[in-house]
């Protein structure tokens, strides 16, 4: 059975684990690395709209955010290996859940990634296009979902604390899920 929507989990983890998809993001990360923690407008508190986060069963640094709102995806289990993620290693993501409604073309993900207090990424992505990265396609049918995916993490991730939030919405702006994760990559010896 071909299942999708959990690519959002892979995306949230992958975005945090390899947060420099373009030259601007890499430039910001290098500035943060060189100059230490900078205080930019905003701060970490605005990355997730609420403090009502819920742990997801399993072994991962990813939690469910905006838990007080109805969400179309119930994540039953989520584990990553290794936990915490490590530079230069493969990251294995295993997840299962239940999707209560079909997700059609036009669904989207709002992603924000911060390195300390510096916002690296704030963008809206097409959920169906992102699903293709894990060999899935839209429409995503309601029902039981499973994910088992490996992501290669580069050695070049600058050390520091990364915080990411990913909120997925249907084409009608109904919340599919909200995922929040914090990962710290130590300095290499």
Swiss-Prot record:
Sorted keywords for this record are: Lipid transport, Signal, Transport
Q: Which range is the signal sequence, renumbered to this chain? A: 1-17
Recorded hits in Pfam families, A to Z, give: E1_DerP2_DerF2
Q: Which InterPro entries match?
A: Ig_E-set (IPR014756), ML_dom (IPR003172), ML_PG-PI_TP (IPR033917), NPC2-like (IPR039670)
List the GO biological process terms: intracellular sterol transport; sterol transport
Q: SUPFAM superfamilies given for it?
A: E set domains
Q: Which GO MF terms are attached to this record?
A: sterol binding
Which positions correspond to the propeptide?
A: 18-52
Query: What task does this protein carry out?
Result: Catalyzes the intermembrane transfer of phosphatidylglycerol and phosphatidylinositol.
Q: How does this protein assemble?
A: Monomer.
> Under which name does UniProt file this protein?
Phosphatidylglycerol/phosphatidylinositol transfer protein
Species, as recorded = Yarrowia lipolytica (strain CLIB 122 / E 150)
User: According to the entry, what is the taxonomic lineage of the organism?
Assistant: Eukaryota, Fungi, Dikarya, Ascomycota, Saccharomycotina
Gene encoding this chain?
A: NPC2
């Amino acid at each position: 059975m071909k299942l999708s929507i959990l690519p959002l989990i892979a995306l949230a983890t992958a975005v945090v684990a390899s947060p420099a998809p373009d030259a601007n993001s890499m430039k910001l990360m290098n500035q943060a690395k060189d100059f230490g923690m900078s205080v930019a407008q905003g701060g970490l508190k605005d990355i997730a709209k609420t403090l009502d986060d819920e742990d997801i069963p399993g072994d991962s640094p990813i939690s469910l955010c905006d838990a007080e709102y109805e969400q179309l995806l119930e994540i039953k289990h989520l584990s990553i290996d290794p936990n915490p993620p490590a530079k230069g290693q493969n990251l294995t993501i295993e997840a299962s859940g239940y999707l209560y409604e079909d997700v059609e073309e036009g669904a989207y993900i709002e992603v924000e990634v911060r390195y300390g207090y510096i916002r690296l990424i704030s963008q809206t992505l097409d959920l169906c296009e992102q699903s293709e990265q894990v060999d899935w396609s839209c429409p995503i049918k309601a029902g039981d979902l499973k994910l088992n995916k490996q992501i290669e993490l580069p050695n070049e991730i600058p050390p520091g604390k990364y915080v990411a939030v990913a909120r997925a919405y249907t084409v009608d702006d109904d919340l599919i899920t909200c995922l929040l994760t914090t990962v710290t990559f130590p300095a290499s010896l």
